[in-house]
Amino acid sequence: MLVLGIESSCDETGLALYDTQRGLLAHALYSQVKMHEEYGGVVPELASRDHIRRAIPLLEQVFSESGVAHGAIDAIAYTQGPGLAGALLVGASVACGLGLALDKPVLGIHHLEGHLLSPLLASEPPEFPFIALLVSGGHTQLMRVDGIGQYTMLGETLDDAAGEAFDKSAKLLGLGYPGGPAISRMAEFGDPTAYKLPRPMLHSKNLDFSFSGLKTAVLTVVKNQTTNICEQDKANIARAFVDAIVEVLTAKCVTALKHTGLKRLVIAGGVGANQQLRESLNAAAAKKHFKVFYPELEFCTDNGAMIAFAGAMRLQINPDAAKKDYAFNVKPRWPLDSIREI
């Protein structure tokens, strides 16, 4: 089965072709980071307009690179939600328009399911069941995954997501956009003993997260500086911030594995690319005797490959999941634990 995947939920336009026999045939991605940089964040209207400009050239690129004819695809999977409404509509319109033109069925995919399954694209994918930490700019969730569509929520953020805390704290330190990579790079030069920031909900009796207080703590430290913050102070604060986030995420993952008795941990989402987090989880895995799986770095960010793959997995379970129904039906808000209804 050959599936075309289309991702357009936020500020990356991604297209990919995935074949259940041959694997990932081609994928192409365009990031709008440079365009949004001057605004300090994603501008939804600009994002939507840029998806329109990029989608068709990227579509032609993946067909050209794969050597596959347009009519050879069996289905089209697109990100149906959650995400920015206008951005989602662009991907949906491309999918439905192409499906109508080629007489191919289409299937809406949950963006977070795409992230959740992206580590399965690796050469040594994890087996079910496993614990998944989904950690990105908009979401921080711990889930038990027993199979495709079999997701049990164990814990989630009660306020800011980890990635959101990264971006906002980076802005407080004047590190620019995107904040996550910037604050992580700065943290590498920081003194881990210079500042001590709180570890929100580290010792709570559940698996939920809360990062708004950590962001506020960074703001307090910045405001308490009597002079302009020098680069070393920024690095020290960044280090304290990253250490706090990483410690909480690692501890919650270890607790989830202990409570469920599982020995496999999957990390998905953009924050999963953070080197400090990977080092911490790898150390915990060696100490606690579990195995941790990550997506390839190129698949940590939003991408079309994960959508094509998720679509292919869905269709293997239920070949009738894709329909020749070309009405747009995007879901800007869409809880992950409801997608088994697809």
From Swiss-Prot:
Q: What is its main location?
A: cytoplasm
Q: By its UniProt entry, which SUPFAM superfamilies does this protein fall under?
A: Actin-like ATPase domain
Under PROSITE patterns, the record lists: GLYCOPROTEASE
Write down how the cofactor binds this protein.
Binds 1 Fe(2+) ion per subunit.
The EC number on file is: 2.3.1.234
Question: Reaction catalysed by this chain?
Answer: L-threonylcarbamoyladenylate + adenosine(37) in tRNA = N(6)-L-threonylcarbamoyladenosine(37) in tRNA + AMP + H(+)
What Gene Ontology terms describe where this protein resides (cellular component)?
cytoplasm
Listed GO molecular functions? iron ion binding; N(6)-L-threonylcarbamoyladenine synthase activity
The coenzyme or cofactor needed here is: Fe(2+)
Query: Single Gene Ontology BP term?
Result: tRNA threonylcarbamoyladenosine modification
> What top-level branch of life does the organism fall under?
Bacteria
Q: List the Gene3D superfamilies hit by this protein, alphabetically.
A: 3.30.420.40
The protein's UniProt keywords, in alphabetical order, are: Acyltransferase, Cytoplasm, Iron, Metal-binding, Transferase, tRNA processing
UniProt binding sites for Fe cation = 111, 115, 302
* Function of the protein: Required for the formation of a threonylcarbamoyl group on adenosine at position 37 (t(6)A37) in tRNAs that read codons beginning with adenine. Is involved in the transfer of the threonylcarbamoyl moiety of threonylcarbamoyl-AMP (TC-AMP) to the N6 group of A37, together with TsaE and TsaB. TsaD likely plays a direct catalytic role in this reaction.
- UniProt xrefs under HAMAP family: TsaD
The name of this protein is: tRNA N6-adenosine threonylcarbamoyltransferase
Q: What is the lineage of its organism?
A: Bacteria, Pseudomonadati, Pseudomonadota, Betaproteobacteria, Burkholderiales
> Source gene?
tsaD
